[in-house]
UniProtKB/Swiss-Prot annotation:
Family membership: Belongs to the UPF0352 family.
Stored Pfam families: DUF1414 (PF07208)
NCBIfam families: PRK13689.1
Name of the protein described by the UniProt record: UPF0352 protein VV1166
Length: 75
């Protein structure tokens, strides 16, 4: 997601690589991978974010996700 972060690219990529390996190990389909990612996001919001901030953060997360999608190339 294209944002300024306090985390290094190396930190993010290392965790992403490990999570990807677990999904590959279990033969997770794209649908299952997205379901798991959604459940992780929901759990983080519900368990680690104040109730008064959850909706705002979820909306910002959704906007960042949409903005990070690549547009199909046209000829």
């Amino acid at each position: 997601m294209p944002i300024t972060s306090k985390y290094t690219d190396e930190q993010v990529e290392s965790i992403l690589t490990e999570i990807g390996a677990v999904l590959d190990k279990h033969g997770a389909t794209p649908e299952l991978s997205l379901m798991i990612a959604g459940n992780i996001a929901t759990n983080v919001l519900n368990q680690q974010v104040a109730a008064s901030q959850r909706k705002l953060i979820a909306e910002k997360f959704a906007q960042a996700l949409i903005s990070s999608l690549q547009e199909p190339k046209t000829h």
